[in-house]
Regions:
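Extracellular/periplasmic carbohydrate-active domains that bind, remodel
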Residues: 1-312
Length: 312
């Protein structure tokens, strides 16, 4: 329950106990470490783990069978590198990866919030490094509105852009990761960045950031206009997305352009099915749907979906 120490929680987890989080907001000043296979972490009533002092609220080791369900992860006022981390980056997963084929780690009904009720700061909101992880219903949200008291810009958006910082929403480095019902929104770089091979996503929803003050703020270092709502890294050779939408609503600067809603490598093993972009209510433009393919979603096509049935 709220008020319990992370050390007490970690001691119990190390003894092989599962973790039940009762309703409430937990101030987490060090990482809850899930290290044993087949551990269950279950939140009730939107139990919320709020980072304190830049802590990563929860980290899962490279072990099979862990279940994280019904938990909300909340960024704090000091920058966290992540809010939920699964597995070790750049690790040789070895035996753990082989076991996880039949006993995968699962993230179910997981919610992530950066800003809204208070200032929030994170680099990568959710980082998945283990192989074969299943993500079943996740909403990863950098706040497009809140009660922080911001005033500069439309609805305080310029203050929000400079204060509620969140670079990337979901970063997947593991192989053979599957997501069903994935929502990731409003991040300042990539809302979803998929670096691993063999990924599969069924139903993806994204709204691009509402709040970039200028096009320069919303331009990649290589000069590409904006950041796609769904990015598969250039070195990936196998990936499937079934059903995805990326929306633009650049209320803070209607002249903002985003080059494409989805950006993927042109290779035979990377396939997208039934994806679209759309401009909501007018402000902002997405020039193409996937890479350089598909129509423009902008002021001339407000509320009209620009659809690519299959890519390539």
């Amino acid at each position: 329950r709220p008020g319990g120490s992370v050390q007490t929680i970690n001691n119990a987890l190390a003894r092989g106990q599962n973790l039940l989080l009762t309703p409430g907001v937990y101030a987490i000043d060090r990482t809850i470490e899930v290290k044993r296979p087949d551990t269950v972490v279950l939140g009730m009533g939107h139990a919320t783990l709020t980072s304190v002092g830049g802590a990563v609220p929860m980290a899962v080791a490279d072990v099979p069978g862990v279940v994280i369900a019904g938990v909300t992860f909340d960024a704090g006022t000091q920058l966290s590198p992540a809010l939920l981390r699964v597995g070790t980056a750049h690790a040789n997963h070895g035996i753990a990866a082989r076991r996880s084929v039949t006993d995968p780690t699962t993230l179910s009904d997981v919610f992530v919030r950066v800003g809204g009720p208070h200032v929030g700061k994170v680099t990568n909101a959710v980082e998945v490094n283990s192989d074969h992880v299943i993500i079943d219903d996740a909403w990863i949200w950098r706040a497009d509105h809140g009660i922080e008291g911001f005033t500069n810009g439309v609805n305080g958006d310029t203050d929000r852009w400079n204060t509620n910082t969140g670079l990337n929403g979901l970063v997947v480095n593991g192989d053979d990761v599957t997501a069903t019902g994935l929502f990731s929104e409003h991040f300042q770089h990539f809302s979803t960045l998929w670096n691993g091979n063999g990924g599969t996503v069924v139903m993806y929803q994204n709204e691009l950031a509402y709040d970039p003050p200028t096009q320069a703020d919303w331009t990649q270092p290589n000069g590409t206009l904006g950041y796609p709502g769904y990015k598969v890294a250039d070195g990936v050779t196998s990936h499937h997305l079934y059903g995805g939408g990326v929306y633009a609503f650049n209320e803070n600067n209607p002249s903002i352009h985003t080059a494409s809603g989805f950006e993927v490598p042109d290779t035979p093993g990377v396939l997208l099915h039934h994806v679209f972009t759309i401009c909501l209510s007018g402000p902002g433009t997405i020039d193409h749907v996937v890479n350089d393919t598909g129509g423009t979603a902008g002021a001339a096509t407000v509320s009209q979906r620009q659809v690519v049935v299959d890519y390539p």
